[in-house]
């Protein structure tokens, strides 16, 4: 496995982690080894996502950078957004969804690296998005104070809910039966069947990251050193532990055959991996820690898996041809308010706008090599300087 982390210093770190042999009476420990540092962007990194082959990073430089973890090479950059990349999510190995401060949500073919669809999702910034485990739905929140549900089968808005405040995190549970929406230090728990708030969890500080460990247990980190475990049914805090000496910026969790592992990154520059006990009331044990000496912003873990069946899109979300009329209708409907939540459509392989393939890449949607990207950036800077001199 490989821990990857982005920082304000424009660098992506990679650390290979291997379990150490455990002797009798000794605590389990993992050994991290520095694998690579990649100066991927010209501004601070803001988001990272991983699948079984690639690591992608988003930045304030408005680009999405791709790194091939199998070959350990720079795979180029995606240039479509006109704003800071705020969120990146893979669904399996075929699709990447990105959100940015330009209000757009883009769906990318993660094989040919082409933009399949671009949606005007929010009137303000897109602050976060989350994909349902089935691949049929997605949720997004933005600075326009709305929570939006997207039908990924037909490629259009399904429901818009005004939430009166700007949420900065939304996250589905592992089975997709509930989801949470985070506003400052408040976590609202929603049930999918009712689309209404079933309860509210209040954290002591502003929440910076959440991750579900199970359908009912939610891990919460905020602008403090402490990580807490909450029960989403009883809305109570099961336990808490001090993870860092400074605020926790991001978290990532995954399962091994033996136990759950929680990875935390802090603005103190440390990345820590924790072994979680089955009883969440018992404090976790530290597996390893990594000092990056950087101001960390985002975190991910690349697991070297040959197959990714658990996250594969369902048959209804597989790419299929889209008629011109259907495409035009989807574009008109995307981003418009829907007064009532629509009934979920039956799976139809003939309709798949968001995850449909495009044989003709449009301008600005295809993969850009690292060399070409740097040339474009240099020309853009010269153009801006020339414009300033002409104005003077």
Swiss-Prot record:
Gene3D superfamilies: YVTN repeat-like/Quinoprotein amine dehydrogenase
Biased composition (Polar residues): 355-368
One MF term in the entry's GO annotations: protein kinase inhibitor activity
Biased composition (Basic and acidic residues): 325-351
Entry's Gene Ontology BP terms: maturation of LSU-rRNA from tricistronic rRNA transcript (SSU-rRNA, 5.8S rRNA, LSU-rRNA); negative regulation of signal transduction; regulation of signal transduction by p53 class mediator; ribosomal large subunit biogenesis
Superkingdom, taxonomy of origin: Eukaryota
Keywords, ordered alphabetically: Nucleus, Repeat, Ribosome biogenesis, Signal transduction inhibitor, WD repeat
Annotated segments matching region Disordered: 309-392
WD repeats: 40-77, 80-118, 121-160, 202-240, 243-284
Subcellular location: Nucleus, Nucleolus
Main location: nucleus
Any one annotated GO CC term: nucleolus
Keyword Repeat part of the UniProt annotation: yes
InterPro entries the UniProt entry points to: G-protein_beta_WD-40_rep (IPR020472), PAK1-Kinase_Regulator (IPR051959), WD40/YVTN_repeat-like_dom_sf (IPR015943), WD40_repeat_CS (IPR019775), WD40_repeat_dom_sf (IPR036322), WD40_rpt (IPR001680)
Ranges of Basic residues composition bias in the record: 381-392
Function of the protein: Negatively regulates the PAK1 kinase. PAK1 is a member of the PAK kinase family, which has been shown to play a positive role in the regulation of signaling pathways involving MAPK8 and RELA. PAK1 exists as an inactive homodimer, which is activated by binding of small GTPases such as CDC42 to an N-terminal regulatory domain. PAK1IP1 also binds to the N-terminus of PAK1, and inhibits the specific activation of PAK1 by CDC42. May be involved in ribosomal large subunit assembly.
Subunit structure comment from the entry: Interacts with PAK1.
Protein name, UniProt field: p21-activated protein kinase-interacting protein 1
Organism of provenance: Bos taurus (Bovine)
């Amino acid at each position: 496995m490989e821990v990857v982390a982005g920082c304000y210093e424009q660098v992506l770190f990679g650390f290979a982690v291997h379990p150490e042999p455990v002797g009798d009476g000794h605590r389990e420990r993992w050994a991290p080894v520095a694998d690579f540092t990649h100066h991927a962007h010209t501004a601070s990194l803001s988001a990272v996502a991983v699948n079984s082959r690639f690591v992608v990073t988003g930045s304030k430089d408005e680009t999405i950078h791709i790194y091939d973890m199998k070959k350990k090479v720079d795979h180029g950059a995606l240039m479509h957004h006109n704003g800071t990349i705020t969120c990146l999510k893979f669904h399996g190995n075929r699709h990447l969804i990105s959100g940015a401060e330009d209000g757009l949500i883009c769906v990318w073919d993660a094989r040919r690296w082409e933009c399949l669809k671009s949606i005007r999702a929010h009137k303000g910034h897109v602050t976060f998005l989350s994909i349902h485990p089935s691949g049929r739905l997605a949720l997004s929140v933005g600075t326009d104070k709305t929570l939006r549900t997207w039908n990924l089968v037909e490629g259009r808005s399904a429901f818009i809910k005004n939430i009166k405040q700007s949420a900065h995190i939304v996250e589905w549970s592992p089975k997709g039966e509930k989801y949470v929406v985070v506003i400052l230090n408040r976590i609202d728990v929603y049930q999918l069947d009712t689309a209404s708030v079933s309860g509210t969890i209040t954290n002591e500080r502003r929440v910076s990251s959440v991750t579900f460990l199970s359908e009912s247990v939610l891990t919460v980190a905020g602008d403090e050193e402490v990580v807490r475990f909450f029960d989403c049914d009883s809305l109570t805090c099961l336990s808490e532990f001090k993870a860092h000496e400074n605020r926790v910026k991001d978290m990532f969790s995954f399962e091994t055959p033996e136990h759950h592992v929680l990875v935390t990154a802090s603005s103190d520059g440390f990345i820590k991996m924790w072994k979680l006990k089955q009883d969440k009331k018992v404090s976790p044990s530290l597996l390893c820690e990594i000092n990056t000496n950087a101001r960390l912003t985002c975190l991910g873990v690349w697991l070297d898996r040959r197959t990714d069946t658990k996250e594969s899109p369902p048959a209804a979300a597989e790419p299929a041809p889209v008629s011109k009329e259907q495409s035009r209708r989807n574009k008109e409907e995307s981003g418009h308010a829907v007064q009532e939540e629509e009934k979920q459509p039956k799976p139809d392989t003939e309709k798949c706008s968001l995850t449909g393939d495009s044989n003709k890449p449009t301008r600005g949607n295809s993969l850009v090599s690292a060399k070409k990207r740097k040339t474009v950036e240099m020309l853009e800077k010269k153009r801006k300087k020339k414009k300033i001199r002409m104005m003077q």
